[in-house]
Regions:
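Extended, low-polarity transmembrane helix blocks
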Residues: 1-36, 48-62, 69-138
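Short amphipathic alpha-helical coupling elements at transmembrane boundaries
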Residues: 39-46
Length: 138
């Protein structure tokens, strides 16, 4: 894959920074707000809630930074897709909610699902040379 069209390299860099940067920042929140997030994870029935919050934060930070800088992007995109899919199903189970909570959980579920799509798109091009990237792969 080449980025031959005008502005494609910059657009791809912006996509990496926006998607990866937001998810890495979200991951940092898992570390700074671990207690509150662990309580919510326990409420949702997640085993080992504190460890799960820390682990998911690690996936988000690793995956996000990986995409932004272009280091092992296949692993980073895979980590993000995994986190987003699992958390959509386990944390945003709108089918078990009622009333206003149902709509909020459905919105979060759908955000995670389109995030899975974006992560899979990055995974699909992970084997190509990325512009403005460190270019370290596996």
């Amino acid at each position: 894959m080449t980025f031959a069209t005008s502005g494609a390299e910059i657009a791809f860099l912006l996509a990496r920074v926006l998607f990866g940067g937001v998810l890495a920042f979200t991951g940092l929140n898992h570390f700074t707000g671990v207690e509150g997030m662990a309580e919510y994870a326990a409420f949702k029935g997640i085993p080992f809630p504190k460890l799960s919050v820390l682990g998911s934060g690690g996936l988000l930070v690793f995956g996000g930074v990986s995409l932004v800088v272009g280091v092992v992007p296949a692993l980073g995109a895979g980590a993000l897709a995994l986190f987003l899919l699992v958390s959509a199903i386990t944390m945003h189970d709108f089918w078990n909610a009622e009333g206003e909570e149902k709509q909020e959980e459905m919105t979060s579920f759908l955000k995670n699902i389109y995030g899975v799509g974006a992560a899979l798109a990055f995974l699909a091009v992970a084997g190509t040379t990325w512009p403005y990237a460190l270019g370290v792969g596996v």
